[in-house]
């Protein structure tokens, strides 16, 4: 399950948070890892770069920036079932 977020000044990697960038938070993947996130409800995908830590809510595997959430059309629901594929690091 993925969620999205839009608040914050600085990410755990030290980068300034940009809600429109194609970025995400993951608990264990190294910063800079590129991940294809696919919304299982509609098949839409986005490639994001991991630059933060989280999510810290049980059952969620990734937190997307607002911009990335918009690409896979999950902002209305707030959360969506997703699949993750590491595509680069």
Explain the meaning of each model-derived region.
Residues 1-89:
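Secreted/periplasmic proteins
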